A protein has these predicted regions:
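A conserved active-site cap/scaffold subdomain adjacent to cofactor or substrate pockets
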Residues: 146-176, 189, 195, 200
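Histidine/acidic-residue-rich, glycine-tolerant segments that coordinate divalent metal ions
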Residues: 2-7, 13-14, 32-150, 160
């Protein structure tokens, strides 16, 4: 799940190799000490966006495990005491009404205006959320030339914090920014949850 154009910026290309090597080392240690048991190595796809382990857990893949070990590349070798953030990834899809931007813009309802107003609202929201809340966004799709009032726009948001409750609150407030922007522009908004995960320590 490399990032588009950038590639494996945080070492995801190493995950499978490292997990397999750890399993081999653990097997050798267990055999040398006469410890019986079964070691499994799972590939966990789509970690970057879809949080693949959540889907696997929901489907019972890990139900019969006594323990699980996971790892992530870092700039030094250590046992992590970090708090891994609770995160929501959402798409905000705005639908408007297309019109010619020069001849009859008053007939249009700009989905792009709605997306921009939403993002402005979120940027003003940053001062009024706890310090560990992060709200990242990108314009994901507009697909219209500049001389057409766009009837479609999509933004993608990552909303994170160190506690699930704070992420829930921030996500609700971002949703409200989207709904308010749609109301202001006479458009509609569809909120699509891409993935969600809890904090972990």
């Amino acid at each position: 799940d490399a990032l588009p154009e950038l590639g494996h910026a945080c070492g995801h290309n190493l995950l499978g190799t490292g997990a397999a090597a750890a399993a081999c080392a653990l097997k050798a240690d267990m055999e040398s000490r006469g410890i019986h048991g079964t070691i499994r190595v799972y590939g966990c796809p789509a970690e970057e966006i879809m949080s693949g382990k959540i889907v696997m857990n929901d489907r019972g893949v890990f139900n019969d495990l006594d323990t699980a070990v996971t790892w992530h590349p870092f700039d030094r070798n250590r046992v992590s005491n970090d708090i891994w953030q609770a995160q929501d990834i959402n798409n905000y899809i705005f639908h408007g009404l297309s019109a010619h931007a020069s001849r009859s813009p008053e007939d249009g309802r700009s989905a792009l205006d709605a997306a921009e107003l939403m993002n402005i609202g979120v940027n003003y929201l940053r001062e009024h959320v706890p310090g560990d809340v992060r709200m990242h966004y990108a314009y994901a799709d507009n697909g219209q030339p500049a001389n057409v009032v766009p009837d479609y726009a999509r933004t993608n948001y990552f909303i994170r914090s160190s506690r699930r409750s704070r992420t829930d609150d921030a996500s609700l407030r971002v949703d409200n920014c989207a709904k308010g922007a749609a109301l202001m522009t006479g458009t509609s908004v569809e909120i699509e949850l891409v993935s969600s995960c809890k904090d972990m320590k």
